[in-house]
Amino acid sequence: MIQTKSRLDVADNTGAKSVLCIKVLGGSKRRYASVGDIIKVSIKEAAPRGRVKKGEVYSAVVVRTAKGIRRGDGSLVKFDGNAAVLLNAKLEPIGTRIFGPVTRELRTERFMKIVSLAPEVL
């Protein structure tokens, strides 16, 4: 469960290491984001020669949450931390690699690219 001011790790090779959620997209009163939701983020920590710079604002999709996601069969998939993948204006991933597992809930038409790049889909 991600909200404004939440810190997330970055699960791609754009050069960003840590981001801060500045807005949950999808309605004026929307408070929380879960796996598969799009958020606006500010880069808080970045590698020196990465594609992105500290302070820049991007869209991102949440790929892992510590809160977890409930499946239809009653099982719950949780992770150790929160992570996101940075997106460009067309909502395509900026990076060319994804690190760590992602959930099956990302398997929609919008995020098939992320699922195909991920080393493991839970």
From Swiss-Prot:
The keyword RNA-binding applies. It holds the Pfam family Ribosomal_L14. SUPFAM superfamilies: Ribosomal protein L14. Keywords: Ribonucleoprotein, Ribosomal protein, RNA-binding, rRNA-binding. GO terms for cellular component: cytosolic large ribosomal subunit. PROSITE patterns: RIBOSOMAL_L14. The keyword rRNA-binding applies. GO terms for biological process: translation. InterPro entries: Ribosomal_uL14, Ribosomal_uL14_bac-type, Ribosomal_uL14_CS, Ribosomal_uL14_sf. CDD domains: Ribosomal_uL14. GO terms for molecular function: large ribosomal subunit rRNA binding; structural constituent of ribosome. Belongs to the universal ribosomal protein uL14 family. Binds to 23S rRNA. Forms part of two intersubunit bridges in the 70S ribosome. Part of the 50S ribosomal subunit. Forms a cluster with proteins L3 and L19. In the 70S ribosome, L14 and L19 interact and together make contacts with the 16S rRNA in bridges B5 and B8. HAMAP family: Ribosomal_uL14 (MF_01367). This is Large ribosomal subunit protein uL14.
